[in-house]
């Protein structure tokens, strides 16, 4: 909605300003897109958002001489984006959350404002359900020879856990972040209650140096595939065999999951890879920072000889991510080698709420519960 459109729809400029002031919300959502509104003194206002292929900074229009700024952005239905406002005053730039938008998404770096396109709804299974009995969180410690230090791992234990039963195991990279920012415990409680997945033991790992340990690190792969499962088998009664063992991770955690399964074939039969940072350079430089160099070396080798790291792999990626091309390229490669693949592209970016919204599809593919065994 530009200044011209505002005047056309609201009459005079003064009427347009008054109408927007009364709304007291931003953005304004319609089937074709969203209109961002900022009220306040500024020399310039820019939208800072992360949609691959579009400018990272888009300028607002000022409405006349008023301290009112608007920006119309086309946004397909069911989209979701995270953003901040860049406010320029007296030559100083400040990035702020949208003051008129209560919707925010937290991540390890802080928080962003959230714009939900027309038709987007947060999945109801990501919200607490009083009918779902909550699982518990326990902490275990183990000395890792592979990593040369002690590691503390939080373990999700499902409600109604019994020592006499055996359970599948899911190991989650950045597991505490999945708890904090992707509602993982709520999702597990709900999906187990609804029989969409079986009761699982879920090991939530966290690395002190994830950009190193998750980037094709042999010691980390050995820890995840050998040391951690061995400890969990002593502490809990786990089902044997790769069909009952899974790895999950997002971004670099997706790389770590694929790498560990590839280095230790037969250890895991199920992988959940969300927005994996699968940079490769076998057909040209990866054009990313040097942090990605060890990732590219692993992915190059994986593309040459993928083998069969798992029986089933779930992949997802947001179409607003620069990683969309790398993730797409994996799908035919995996299928060519006899792996069952579920792949989803969504109108979202590289963020935790994107990964949260995919958890039902991911977990029911990796570990279908009684409900899916009946209806699929």
Q: Each PLM stretch: what is its role?
A:
Residues 1-56, 63-376:
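Non-catalytic cap/lid and distal C-terminal segments of serine-dependent acyl enzymes
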């Amino acid at each position: 909605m530009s200044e011209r459109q505002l005047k056309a729809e609201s009459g005079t400029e003064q009427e347009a300003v008054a109408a927007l002031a009364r709304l007291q919300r931003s953005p304004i959502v319609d089937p074709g897109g969203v209109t961002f509104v900022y009220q306040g003194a500024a020399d310039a206002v820019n939208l800072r958002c992360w949609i691959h292929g579009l400018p990272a900074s888009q300028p607002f229009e000022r409405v006349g001489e008023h301290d009112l700024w608007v920006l119309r952005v086309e946004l397909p239905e069911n989209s979701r984006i995270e953003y901040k406002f860049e406010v320029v005053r007296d030559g100083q730039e400040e990035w702020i959350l949208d003051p008129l938008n209560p919707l925010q998404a937290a991540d390890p770096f802080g928080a962003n404002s959230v714009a939900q396109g027309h038709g987007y709804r947060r999945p109801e299974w990501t919200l607490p359900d009083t009918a779902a009995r909550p699982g518990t969180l326990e902490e275990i410690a183990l000395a890792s020879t592979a990593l040369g230090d002690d590691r503390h791992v939080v373990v999700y234990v499902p409600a109604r856990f019994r020592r006499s039963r055996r359970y599948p195991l899911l190991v989650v990279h950045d597991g505490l972040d999945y708890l904090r920012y992707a509602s993982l415990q709520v999702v597990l409680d709900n999906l187990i209650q609804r029989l969409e997945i079986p009761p699982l033991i879920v090991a939530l790992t966290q690395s002190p140096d994830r950009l190193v340990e998750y980037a094709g690190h042999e010691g980390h792969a050995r820890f995840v595939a050998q040391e951690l499962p061995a400890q969990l088998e002593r502490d809990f009664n786990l089902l044997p065999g790769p069909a009952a063992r899974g790895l999950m991770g997002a971004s670099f955690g997706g790389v770590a999951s694929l790498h560990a399964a590839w280095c230790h074939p037969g250890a895991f039969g199920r992988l959940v890879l969300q927005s994996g940072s699968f940079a490769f350079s076998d057909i040209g430089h990866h054009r990313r920072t040097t942090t990605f160099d060890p990732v590219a070396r692993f992915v190059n080798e994986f593309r040459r000889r993928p083998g069969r790291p798992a029986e089933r792999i779930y992949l997802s990626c947001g179409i607003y991510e620069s990683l969309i091309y790398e993730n797409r390229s994996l799908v035919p490669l995996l299928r060519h080698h006899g792996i069952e693949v579920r792949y989803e592209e969504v109108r979202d970016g590289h963020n935790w709420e994107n990964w949260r919204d995919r958890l039902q599809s991911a977990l029911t593919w990796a570990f279908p519960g009684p409900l899916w065994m009946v209806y699929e």
